[in-house]
Regions:
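A nucleotide-sugar donor-handling region in carbohydrate enzymes
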Residues: 1-19
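Leloir-type glycosyltransferase catalytic cores
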Residues: 1-3, 128-169
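Hydrophobic transmembrane signal anchors and adjacent membrane-proximal interface regions, especially
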Residues: 7-9, 35, 50, 149-151
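Short acidic/His/Gly/Ser-rich catalytic and metal-binding motifs that mark active-site loops
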Residues: 17-27, 67-70, 140-143
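Phenylalanine-focused residue identity feature
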Residues: 18, 34, 85, 108, ...
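Donor-binding and catalytic core of enzymes assembling or modifying cell-surface/extracellular glycoconjugates
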Residues: 26-122, 129-132
């Protein structure tokens, strides 16, 4: 199933359950396919594609409704664990976020690059991986919705401490 003409690079841009932020006035979900606490910034993801697309067949792993990238094979439908694990096993490179795929790669002993924004590799990561951690915010931030982790995963935009991508990495 995973045979391609070039070696496979997996680019996981979003992951985990996505609970949309609710508009407090209407009670309706805000249409925003990006969760700043977990998702790889779009600019970084596209620059990875631009750099590696000549040498690799890039498969973007994202959730339904996640942002799209130019020049990738997009996987945004639910796959079985066997399908996901086999894709990890046959891939040549993996650029991931803190999600199940980085744990799978570690279980297979496959060094990967993992982006960390709202979580920490000290808690959830592996020394095997090349862990890229977001910079700490320069200003104090009221984390009113966060009680389990430094930041909640449900896209609390009111907690986002970064004004631009340059502030993050």
């Amino acid at each position: 199933k995973w045979v391609r003409e070039k070696p496979i690079l997996i680019l996981q841009t979003t992951g985990g359950p996505f609970i949309p932020q609710m508009n407090p006035q209407t009670g309706q979900p805000i249409d925003n396919p990006y969760a700043w606490t977990r998702d790889m910034p779009i600019e970084i993801a596209q620059s990875v594609v631009d750099k590696y697309s000549k040498d690799y067949h890039i498969i973007q792993i994202t959730r339904q409704g996640g942002y799209g990238l130019q020049g990738v094979e997009r996987m945004d439908t639910q796959m079985s664990n066997i399908e996901l694990f086999s894709l990890i096993a046959v891939s040549k490179k993996r650029i991931l976020i803190d999600s199940a795929l980085q744990h799978t790669a570690a279980a297979f002993g496959l060094k990967s690059t993992v982006f960390w924004i709202g979580t920490s590799p000290k808690v959830f990561g592996y020394k095997l991986h090349n862990n890229i951690v977001a910079k700490l915010p320069k200003k104090a931030n009221q984390l009113i919705n966060s009680y389990t982790f430094d930041f909640q995963f449900d896209n609390n935009i009111n907690e986002c401490p970064y004004m631009s991508i340059n502030d993050m990495f």
